[in-house]
Every structure is written in structure tokens, then in C-alpha cells.
């Protein structure tokens, strides 16, 4: 039933946002998918983490940009402190989602908020609506496609409780790469590179060199699969793309394939999530029926993600080597045995 739950929630989110003309339709689809991939049964705590994490980081970013944007040094310090706490939270299972969504959404908001012409408040409200809608959408998915009651775990998330030294090293690695990415997106004119920025943070999530390199491969494979599916939908529908029924049916068919992957092992789940993201974002943000197609947007998305993944992998490797060359930085005082 899990693949059906994920598929139902994903398609329902896109359907609601399409029929009502809401912006940020991609979040309406991806937030429920992100939650349902981690859940085997209903868990209120995970939804609380998601909602609080997004609401809190939105407030943080609004305050940082509103008060500190004219002062780059102070803004850099404030962002560094904020991202450090997000990276640290990701190492603890009870608050992993709170930290991860804070790191991801916070970085996106900081990037877009740096452009004067961008309406940050409207974007934040759209994210809030998508976040709140995740609760009823997932609830309806669990109601329509329940699983038999089992003794298995309620949820499975990536947060890891490790030794203090390992936590410090991996937190430093994640924070270092996140800060470099923040500076790059602040200095360069990359306001149309949402997918590339998200890819940086997605492959950073494991907080380890080996895990991040594996995540990079998964991200590339999933993105190529999703982009090919999005192009196929556009070519098949052609000038009939402005028909909402045909559009939603085509999207549902393509999403169904990737949602089956999401219910498999972690590797397939990673490929599936990257694919569903690559399918959803260009078709919900760049396509304007009768006016603008998404062909070049899909090509740009694939190429920008490829460049971002390669560059991030190099940054993670360099950061790993740099931190390993300074073992004294993470040395903890030894406790004397009584």
C-alpha cells in the first residue's frame, strides 16, 4: 500500500494546486512525498517537526534578511549560526526532519531573498500553505490506503546518533559545505537555479564523504529519469498540454512509476525522489500552456544539477581532507576513570 499512498498524495497535491491556481505547486507534491517515504504508519511527531521546522526557519530568514542584509559580515555570522544548528540537529533522529527541512528551505529562502525584485513574503506564504496542506493530504492517503497492522517500525529516517567526535566532524563538514554554497549563491546571479541549490543540500544530507558521493550518483540517475519523463509528457501531449485532464493523467502515470521506486530500499527511494522532483518542478513552474513549454527548462535543470552535483562532490572531498588534516580541532577531553 505504501507506493499507492505516495502516488495518491503526490498526484492529489499537484491536482489541488493546478485546479486552484496556487503557486509553488512543486511543494504541494514534494512535501507529502518526503513525509510518506519515511512513514510506515501515521506519526504525528514527524508532521510537527515538518511544520515547526519550516515555520521557524521562515521566521529566521525573514529576520536575517530584513535586519542584516545591509551588513554582509553580520548576515554571514547569523546565517552561519543558523545553519550550524540545523546541521547539528540532523545527527539526532528525534529532530532530524526539523534540522533537514530547516537547512534545505532556509538555504532556498536565503538565496531568493537576496534579490530585491523577488517577493519573499508571497513565496513564504506559498510554502506555509503547502506545509499545512501536507497534513490532510497524507491523512487522506493513509485513510484510503492503510497498511495491515504490523510490528514494524513506524518510521525510518536518516538521522544517526554517533560518538561525539564523529558528530562534530560530520557537522563541521556539512556546515562548511553549506556555508560555501550560501556564499556562492549570494555572490553569483543564480536566482533561477533552485534545482541546483536543492541538489547541493540533498547530497550533503548523509554528512559523510562516502554517503555524499553515493547520494551524488543517485541524484544524477534520478534527475535524468525524471527529466526524460517530463520531456516525454510534453512531446506526447504537444499542443494539448493546456487540457488539465490530459496533463494530470499524464503526470499521474509518470509519477506512478517513480512512486514504486520510492517504496523500495534506500537507494531506489533516493533515485525515485530525485526523479519525482525532476518530473514535478519543470511541469509545475516553467510550463505555461499555450505560451511557454518546458523543454529548455528541463535541459537547463539537468545540466545545472549535473554541474552542481560534481562541484559539491569536489567541495565535500576537499572539506573532508581539510578537516582530517586538523584532528586537534575535534579532540575531546578524556574522562578519567575513577
Regions found by a protein language model. Name each.
Residues 1-98, 111-253, 257-338:
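Alpha-helical transmembrane segments and their membrane-interface boundaries
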Residues 105-106, 110:
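Hydrophobic transmembrane helix module of multi-pass membrane transport proteins
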